[in-house]
Amino acid sequence: FEEVSKVISLFLTFVINKFAPYAIFCLLTRTFAIYGIDSLKPALAYVVTVIIALFAYLFIAYPIYLMTMARVNPKPFMKKAAKVALFGFSTSSSAATLPLNRKTTVEELGVHDQIASFVLPLGMTVNMDGTAIMQVIAAMFVAVSSGYKVTFMSMAIIAILALIASIGTPAAPGAGAVILFTILTGMGYTNDAALLAYSLILAINRPIEMLVTSLNVTGDAATSVIVAKKEKMLDEEIYHS
């Protein structure tokens, strides 16, 4: 399974890096030709919304998880995990961040190596909080901007689809935006306006993907701390040092 995952990740990275710029350029050219430069204004609202949601989850949700589920002070975690988040931001790849994440969780957060060795690789492909958040907001942005009616039921379905899709998202740069298309197709958001909105997301989503990766790898580290605490395999002296 691990070898297959690596092959898929390498293949997606190659395809995205090689062909995505040309595809995005063609889509944007058509977008600006039809709607003009004003079509970028709604996209800015999408960017701001995603950034606020990601930072809120990072600085509010994770500390709450650590305090309530692991019964530890979240300040040492946030301080020590900062370099993991920064590395994830710069590489935009959970797979590339895995060695540093494992080293940090074991040596600085006091997580037993057995826990880190199991939780972190699993979380790299399953625990995709940031990806799910981005895909939900992006799908709603596409729906609203392309004239589809968004109801509470449709939002719930989008959230479920995003959760399922994020679990299988490969740990490769830009993969989240590619998987987003499956959600849009599943919801039936496939008219011309929806495709144009999706092209805007592809064009501006690189910094968003970097923040998403930071959130994902931080979530993996937080989960390993919680699991280690539950299994009584967390060295709290190292954690609080």
Question: What do the predicted segments below correspond to?
Answer:
Residues 1-76, 237-241:
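Signature of multi-pass transmembrane helix bundles
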